[in-house]
Amino acid sequence: MTTSLLLHPRWPESLMYVYEDSAAESGIGGGGGGGGGGTGGAGGGCSGASPGKAPSMDGLGSSCPASHCRDLLPHPVLGRPPAPLGAPQGAVYTDIPAPEAARQCAPPPAPPTSSSATLGYGYPFGGSYYGCRLSHNVNLQQKPCAYHPGDKYPEPSGALPGDDLSSRAKEFAFYPSFASSYQAMPGYLDVSVVPGISGHPEPRHDALIPVEGYQHWALSNGWDSQVYCSKEQSQSAHLWKSPFPDVVPLQPEVSSYRRGRKKRVPYTKVQLKELEKEYAASKFITKEKRRRISATTNLSERQVTIWFQNRRVKEKKVVSKSKAPHLHST
């Protein structure tokens, strides 16, 4: 079985890769590629198996079996004119199922591609072969990832539409055999990082939360409930509520933290006598008078000013109370 792969790189001539499955089919694929020549140095791949083929690609120097190789053929075999240098680039990959595991040739080095190019690669994992591809702009129906099992896993079938692939760019899909060795541990959150964990083409966005085996804290004093602690106990200790009625949160001393009024210090009789004398002389104090009273009474100028203000308010209240009965009587 021979399948052609068409590429449109930046080179003057587009290239075609021929993928062969067995040595018996090598002669069939070699007949169509006899017209190619001079392009073997442009790409990389594996050496050919039949003498009638185009010059083989020995640039990579990779050792592959002669029954499973890719050869480089010139584009004019298809009967199409060569693509210009400035033409928009694109590449199309077609997945080829292989009956045997891990017998893939190394892909040729991809030329510098634009944002609409397709990158394909493969790597062996255990006894199986995984071939994955990053697609930016694909218009054909194809698989984003081909899995070639070793001996007991069949190849999952089903193709994805092109529009589904374009919306799921740079997405990997891994199949059940890869995740079968993983076992979710109880009490932990298993959030899916890769959108596609199973072989199903649709992406999976849910998170597995296996909590059936979860057990709360085992307290030594026999409490049968969970304990919740506040992260900001130092700042909001009064908001913390304990599920246990006998637990009381520690309350900090309010007097040490709260900025309240200073303790009232009463004036002495000598100070009050001096202040009353000055108030009787004048209800309003001047700057020079305030300094003199402050020096004689050992009080600050602010204290003297406040006392005079309070004294005027007190006198005003006394006068208003004395006038109130006189108004009611008339």
Swiss-Prot record:
Impact after mutating residue 271 to R: In ECTD9; uncertain significance
Keywords: Developmental protein, Disease variant, DNA-binding, Ectodermal dysplasia, Homeobox, Nucleus, Transcription, Transcription regulation
Compartments where found: Nucleus
Disease: Ectodermal dysplasia 9, hair/nail type: A form of ectodermal dysplasia, a heterogeneous group of disorders due to abnormal development of two or more ectodermal structures such as hair, teeth, nails and sweat glands, with or without any additional clinical sign. Each combination of clinical features represents a different type of ectodermal dysplasia. ECTD9 is characterized by hypotrichosis and nail dystrophy without non-ectodermal or other ectodermal manifestations.
Upper lineage: Eukaryota, Metazoa, Chordata, Craniata, Vertebrata
Family: Belongs to the Abd-B homeobox family.
InterPro entries: AP_axis_regulatory_Homeobox, HD, Homeobox_CS, Homeodomain-like_sf, HoxA13_N
Biological role: Transcription factor which plays a role in hair follicle differentiation. Regulates FOXQ1 expression and that of other hair-specific genes.
Regions of compositional bias (Gly residues) in chain numbering: 30-47
DNA-binding region listed in the record: 260-319
Name under which the protein is recorded: Homeobox protein Hox-C13
BP GO annotations: anatomical structure morphogenesis; anterior/posterior pattern specification; hair follicle development; nail development; positive regulation of DNA-templated transcription; regulation of transcription by RNA polymerase II; tongue morphogenesis
A Gene Ontology cellular-component term: chromatin
Principal subcellular localization: nucleus
MF GO annotations: chromatin binding; DNA-binding transcription activator activity, RNA polymerase II-specific; DNA-binding transcription factor activity; DNA-binding transcription factor activity, RNA polymerase II-specific; DNA-binding transcription factor binding; RNA polymerase II cis-regulatory region sequence-specific DNA binding; sequence-specific double-stranded DNA binding; transcription cis-regulatory region binding
Superkingdom per UniProt: Eukaryota
Positions of region (Disordered): 30-50
Gene3D superfamilies named in the record: Homeodomain-like
Pfam families: Homeodomain, HoxA13_N
